[in-house]
Amino acid sequence: MWKTLHQLAIPPRLYQICGWFIPWLAIASVVVLTVGWIWGFGFAPADYQQGNSYRIIYLHVPAAIWSMGIYASMAVAAFIGLVWQMKMANLAVAAMAPIGAVFTFIALVTGSAWGKPMWGTWWVWDARLTSELVLLFLYVGVIALWHAFDDRRLAGRAAGILVLIGVVNLPIIHYSVEWWNTLHQGSTRMQQSIDPAMRSPLRWSIFGFLLLSATLTLMRMRNLILLMEKRRPWVSELILKRGRK
């Protein structure tokens, strides 16, 4: 198994594999998100308490879920990079960090907009909101560490250590609404009372965000591989082939 993984992690091979998957994932993400958003924003019934303002859920919840999901994936990659010294694992951490940061920012902004009518303010130092803000700072810290060192191996090690330290924040985000008395509503997935006509497009949106994050990660992986391997012969050959086209 590890032999196969190491073979797949060879830069030219991984670059090629990413290229195979990107078009299909991109098409799938556009289709799934289009279905989820048209269904959710256009055809799902209005909420009996919040009216149409609840529809921001189709943007907020997927972004919030995958802001944590991406970080968990980064933690797995960071562990592999630190333990088995796989350069491509460190590269995966660097590839996912900006995407996770954007998803976290979207979750915070949409959450504030959604909470304004109910809380009477754009921001409260609620346990869920504060821990999600900490997650954004962790993403920014990982990005900063990756760019702070010229040595990619050292940069990957430093970023990986920060990622693993920050994992403790994930259960705090998830269980904050259960551990503390917070203003934030309970986890959406736990609320079985939600109307199926609202829940189905939400699931499409969540899956669409997953496909989108995978697409963007693979695109960034290809760019980072080229940047890291820019002095290798295979990159020069690739540039020449593209130039002939």
From Swiss-Prot:
Q: Which InterPro entries match?
A: Cyt_c_assembly, Cyt_c_biogenesis_CcmC, Cyt_c_biogenesis_CcsA/CcmC
- Gene Ontology cellular component? ATP-binding cassette (ABC) transporter complex; plasma membrane
Which organism does this record belong to?
Answer: Escherichia coli (strain K12)
Q: How does it sit in the membrane?
A: Multi-pass membrane protein
Name one molecular function that GO assigns to this entry.
heme binding
Location (main, coarse): membrane
Q: Say what the protein does.
A: Required for the export of heme to the periplasm for the biogenesis of c-type cytochromes.
Q: Give residue spans on the Cytoplasmic membrane side.
A: 1-20, 85-90, 150-159, 227-245
Protein's UniProt keywords contain Mitochondrion: no
Q: What is this protein called?
A: Heme exporter protein C
A GO biological-process term: cytochrome c biosynthetic process
- Localization, UniProt: Cell inner membrane
Q: Where are the transmembrane segments?
A: 21-41, 64-84, 91-111, 129-149, 160-180, 206-226
Q: Which domain of life is it from?
A: Bacteria
Q: Which UniProt keywords apply?
A: Cell inner membrane, Cell membrane, Cytochrome c-type biogenesis, Membrane, Transmembrane, Transmembrane helix, Transport
Similarity section: Belongs to the CcmC/CycZ/HelC family.
List the stretches on the Periplasmic face of the membrane.
42-63, 112-128, 181-205
